């Protein structure tokens, strides 16, 4: 069974190897998230996403450069999985079960 994935758009403070950086949270699911940043972040770096209610720890497993910056995927630790009960990003849209209508 695949995890429910959600699109979102929210500025987040992400601690990367003990340094705080502002990044944009683009997508989230129970085991991970995708972020956008203006500067590169090394693959394998340990990160913490802190919100007012919770902390999600993990590591960067993929980094891609694109026209406007850097996109990277974080795999959350099994000890800190994401749930909407702990942190609900603004502009959340579930995409895992959306189907496009054919005309």
List PLM regions with ranges:
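Structured alpha-helical
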Residues: 1-103
């Amino acid at each position: 069974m695949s995890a429910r994935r959600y699109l979102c758009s929210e500025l987040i403070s992400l601690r990367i190897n003990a340094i705080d950086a502002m990044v944009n949270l683009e997508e989230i699911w129970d085991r991970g998230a995708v972020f956008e940043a203006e500067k590169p972040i090394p693959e394998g770096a340990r990160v913490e996403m802190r919100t007012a209610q919770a902390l999600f720890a993990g590591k960067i497993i993929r980094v891609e450069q694109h026209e406007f910056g850097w996109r990277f995927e974080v795999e959350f630790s099994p000890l800190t999985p994401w749930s909407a009960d702990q942190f609900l990003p603004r502009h959340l849209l579930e995409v895992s079960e959306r189907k496009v209508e054919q005309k």
